Amino acid sequence: MLSFQYPDVYRDETSVQEYHGHKICDPYSWLEDPDSEQTKAFVEAQNKITVPFLEQCPIRGLYKERMTELYDYPKYSCHFKKGKRYFYFYNTGLQNQRVLYVQDSLEGEARVFLDPNTLSDDGTVALRGYAFSEDGEYFAYGLSASGSDWVTIKFMKVDGAKELPDVLERVKFTCMAWTHDGKGMFYNSYPQQDGKSDGTETSTNLHQKLCYHVLGTDQSEDILCAEFPDEPKWMGGAELSDDGRYVLLSIWEGCDPVNRLWYCDLQQEPNGITGILKWVKLIDNFEGEYDYVTNEGTVFTFKTNRNSPNYRLINIDFTDPDESKWKVLVPEHEKDVLEWVACVRSNFLVLCYLHDVKNILQLHDLTTGALLKTFPLDVGSVVGYSGRKKDSEIFYQFTSFLSPGVIYHCDLTKEELEPMVFREVTVKGIDAADYQTIQIFYPSKDGTKIPMFIVHKKGIKLDGSHPAFLYGYGGFNISITPNYSVSRLIFVRHMGGVLAVANIRGGGEYGETWHKGGILANKQNCFDDFQCAAEYLIKEGYTSPKRLTINGGSNGGLLVAACANQRPDLFGCVIAQVGVMDMLKFHKFTIGHAWTTDYGCSDTKQHFEWLLKYSPLHNVKLPEADDIQYPSMLLLTADHDDRVVPLHSLKFIATLQYIVGRSRKQSNPLLIHVDTKAGHGAGKPTAKVIEEVSDMFAFIARCLNIEWIQ
C-alpha cells in the first residue's frame, strides 16, 4: 500500500549520454527546459501534493505565528561614513527589505534615503550592491527582481536623494567602483544573449566584460576597459586604490581563492578613460589570492594565501615587484585564519582572525605590522564592519547563536582605544540565559578532528530522546560561523530541539588546507565528516536517528542529499534547499562552470569518476534491508534561482519518487516545493522567509511526530 500517490512522470529512456565510455541514462533531461508545458505541469503536480501536506502539518500555524512574533525585532547594520554624512541600514522588524537611512551627524535626525520596499508590492525587488562616489555626493545601486542574480544599476544624487536617469542593464556578479573624480564608475556586464534573461533561464554566463560608465551618458556609450576573449570563464572586478591613482583588476577563473592582479596607473592615461586600459600584469597566474588592503605611494599591502594557507599581509613595491623583493608585514598565524583586513585612520590596520570558528579582532600598525590592541569580543562572529583609511573611527557588529547583535563604536583619535556599545538589540520571548552553546571536536572517519557547535536548553537529559537539527555546508572556502537564527531557536524552544552546526571540511574554517581537504578528489570527506557529526550526536545521547533532521542549502543541499543516499538509516528527515544534485551536468547551466574548482568537471575522465560516485541524482537506490527506508525528504527550490537552477531539484525528486517512492516499505514522504518569484536566497523578502521556515519546521514536526511546547 503506497503511503503517497506521487504524480506519474514520463521517463525518456532514450535520453542517454556517453561519458568516457560509460552510458549514463538521464530519463528526466526534459525537465531541463524550464519553459516547456511539460515542466510547468510537473512543477504544478508536485506542488499540488506538497502544499496541502505542509498546510495540514499540525504545528504550522503555531510556528508561523511565533516566528512572526519573535522575528519582529529591530535589525541594524553598522553606520558607515560617506563624504560628510553617515548611513546605515535598518529594518523595523518585519519589513520585507531593509531600508537605507542617512544622517548628517551621529546625533542628527535620521531620514530615509532609499527604501526598496516601495519598489514592489510584495517585497521581491531587493537591493543587490551599492557604491558611493568618493566625495559621497553620488550613489549607484543595483536592484534584482524575484531573487535573480541579474542586476539593474541605477544612480542618485545624494543631496535631496534625487533619482538620475542613468540605467545599466545586463549586469551580474559585478564590481561597482567610482573613479575618485566622481565622473563615472567601473562595472561588469555580459554580452546580449538569445532568449530571456530574467533569472528563469539556464543559459551559461561567459565572457564577462569590465566597462566604465560616465555619469549622465547612455549605457550604449560606456567604455570597454577589459575583456578576455580567449578566456570565457574569467571574471575581472575593479577597485580604486585609496589614493585614487590606481585601478586594480582582480581576475578570477572560478570559485577558488586565487586571482590574477593587474593594475593601471591612471596618471599614465592622460586623456582619461577612453578604451582598454594600459594594464600592468603584476600577478599573472592563479597561484595565490591577492586582496588589496591599502597603499602608501607605490608600496601596496595585500592579504594573500601565497605560500601561506592561513593568509598573511605582504608589501609589494610596484617599482620593484619581483616576488623575491616582497616583504612580510604580518606573518601567517600557525593556526588562526586571517579573514579580512581594513586600513583606517591612515596608519592603523584592523585585522579579523578566525580562531576555532570564533572571531578575534585586532588593531595593528600599518608601518611595522605590530599588534597594538585586541578588541574584547564574546564567543561568536564579527558580521559587520565600517571604517576606511580616511575615517578616524570604526564600527563593528558582533553576533552569536544566542545574541542577535551588538554594534560597537571606537574613536581612534582618543588616547584610550576603548570601544563603546553603540547599539544592542534584545529579542523578547527568548531568554538567552535558558540555553547553552558548547563547541566540541569530534573525530571524522579518517581521524581528523571536526569542530561542531551545539545549542540546547540548559539541563536536558542526554537520553537520545531529543529532536536534533544538524546543519552543514562544507565547500568553497566558506566558514560557517555562529549566527543568530530565530527560526532555529524556535525549534529549540518550542519543539524541544537540539541545534548542531558542523564545521566540516571544504569550508574555510582552518584556511586553504581545510578547503582543499573537502574538494575535488577529497569531496567524500565532507560527507564522512557530516555523517560522523550525526553519529556523535546519537552516541552522546543528544538524539536518535529517527529524531534527527539534516539541513543544508546550495552546496549544503548536495551535502544532505548525498548523505541521505549513502546513509538513509542515519537520519529521520532531510531538508535540501536549492541543492546541486546533477554533478555530471552542473557546469552547463548559468554560472555552474565556476564551481568546477571545487567539484571538478565530468568532461575530464578522472573527475567524472569522482563525481559519479556521489552525485545525488545518480546514486538513488532502494535500501536492501527490509527495515530501512529513505528519511522523509523535502526539497526546496524556486523559479528564479539562476545560481543553482531548479532543474537539479526537479530531476532529483522525480528520480527519488520513481526509484524509492513506489516501494511498499517507503512510508516517509519524498516531496518538493517550488516557490515562485524567488531565487537562490539573497534578497528574499521577510514574508517569504517566514513562509519557508514555517514549511521546513512544520514538515519536520509532522514527519518526526514532534509536539509543540508552549
Curated annotation (Swiss-Prot):
Localization terms from the record: Cytoplasm
EC nos: 3.4.21.26
Catalytic activities: Hydrolysis of Pro-|-Xaa >> Ala-|-Xaa in oligopeptides
PROSITE patterns according to UniProt: PRO_ENDOPEP_SER
Residue numbers bearing the N-acetylmethionine modification: M1
N6-acetyllysine modification, residue list: K157
Keywords: Acetylation, Cytoplasm, Hydrolase, Protease, Serine protease
An example molecular function term from Gene Ontology annotations: serine-type endopeptidase activity
Presence of the UniProt keyword GTP-binding in the record: no
EC class (word): hydrolase
InterPro entries linked to this entry: AB_hydrolase_fold, Pept_S9_AS, Pept_S9A_N, Peptidase_S9_cat, Peptidase_S9A, Prolyl_oligopep/macrocyclase
Active-site residues annotated for this sequence: S554 (charge relay system), D641 (charge relay system), H680 (charge relay system)
Main location, first listed in the record: cytoplasm
Gene Ontology process terms (BP): angiotensin maturation
GO cellular component: a single term: nucleus
Source superkingdom: Eukaryota
Pfam family for this entry, one: Peptidase_S9
Family: Belongs to the peptidase S9A family.
Stated role: Cleaves peptide bonds on the C-terminal side of prolyl residues within peptides that are up to approximately 30 amino acids long.
Protein name: Prolyl endopeptidase
Classification lineage: Eukaryota, Metazoa, Chordata, Craniata, Vertebrata
